[in-house]
Amino acid sequence: MMEEDIGDTEQWRHVFQELMQEVKPWHKWTLIPDKNLLPNVLKPGWTQYQQKTFARFHCPSCSRSWASGRVLIVFHMRWCEKKAKGWVKMRVFAQRCNQCPEPPFATPEVTWDNISRILNNLLFQILKKCYKEGFKQMGEIPLLGNTSLEGPHDSSNCEACLLGFCAQNDLGQASKPPAPPLSPTSSKSAREPKVTVTCSNISSSRPSSKVQMPQASKVNPQASNPTKNDPKVSCTSKPPAPPLSPTSLKSAREPKVTVTCSNISSSRPSSKVQMPQASKVNPQTSNPTKNDPKISCTSKPSTTPRLTIQQLSVVSPPAPAPTCVIQMPSPTPIDGSRAADVAKENTRSKTPKALLSSPLYVPPTSSYVPPTSSYVPPTSSYVPPTSSYVPPTSSSVIVPISSSWRLPENTICQVERNSHIHPQSQSSCCGACCESWCEIFRYSCCEAACNCMSQSPLCCLAFLILFLLLWYLL
């Protein structure tokens, strides 16, 4: 590790200014080395702070080097609130070589890490004594040093001891060398006490949504080992041990904690959350475990019933297939006397163009649709159609269908259109000629012709000949 000479005070000043700017950026503090500074000799308005540190020395005569962990550093501090300025005087006491006859005092060399730690401790004292700030339990930062130093302190060659300020006196707990960490071999002989915590059973008799906090329960003064049949969950952990000296490793005892919890049973489904009850801790047990740290966990599955939720799919009944029936009335009125004779209709099924383009259209099986039983003959009193009735102008009827509406699947549409209605007695002749006759006269009324043909066969023959002549001429 790189070491700095105390004679080069720029390193000390640089670190000190950085620390002060972090806590008091608007105040000005100055660090002044003073070789004539004496401990416990203070001027009015000044306070003192002293600390021991580790340093290395080099003899200027024989070039011999040595290290010491009893190097005394003294600080005198003063703060002027009116001027917003502060001053710190510092002195590091030196040592001399014990091999030379009349050696001079050598300047100590302090490592960079220890310089930072010493000035941090000084900053705490400034906040506490000058600004009346800080915490009551604010401790000093321990310093780093070589723990392999052996032998007593050479007080005959120590500057502080020669002046009467012996550095061997305890100046604070932070100046003691830090203890080395525990080695694996030295921790085997340490025995740890065992602490057992037992929790009682917790049961639930009815559903509830309450949350219960831990309750205190009594524990026997001497806890015995739990039986194997009892369900339990035991956890044993070993916290890290604090640094100890090699001489005190044998007597070190580490605590050991064992937590035992019983089952949580429920007779009915419940949303109640219960926590194990707290219990008193027994510092002594009958059977301690092994010396090595361990973590053991033993658990038994809980008997709490589980609720299974199965999501059922929604079954929707199939929609009935709608039937669209459009029946156009005859443009000519029908007398009441002829209503009984109208039993059969020679229909001509013509499907609207909009329905033909639909993929759900089912064509009718026959163009002829016989009259159903739901036919109601008109009464004797004829009621003419109202003004709201609009007769169709074309033989093809187009049913307006909204673009946003589509027929559901399996939809059957049937369109009926009645042609000219003829009496039942005229069915023999109309079946042969009426359809062609209507096409020639562009669906004009052929009632007179049908009446004539119904009177005599000769009249029918005459009309047939006339029809052929007209067909030939046209």
Curated annotation (Swiss-Prot):
Biased region (Polar residues) positions are 197-228, 259-304
At the top level, the lineage of the source is Eukaryota
The record, for Pfam families, names: Zn_ribbon_3CxxC
Q: How does it sit in the membrane?
A: Single-pass type III membrane protein
Location of this chain's protein in the cell: Membrane
UniProt topological domain (Cytoplasmic) ranges = 1-453
Q: What GO annotations for molecular function exist for this entry?
A: zinc ion binding
Region annotation (Disordered) ranges:
175-304
Can you supply one Gene Ontology CC term for this chain's record? membrane
User: What are the TM regions of this chain, as residue ranges?
Assistant: 454-474
The task this protein performs is described as:
Promotes functional cell surface expression of the bitter taste receptors TAS2R16 and TAS2R43.
The family assignment reads: Belongs to the TMEM7 family.
- The protein in question is named Receptor-transporting protein 3
Species assigned in the record:
Mus musculus (Mouse)
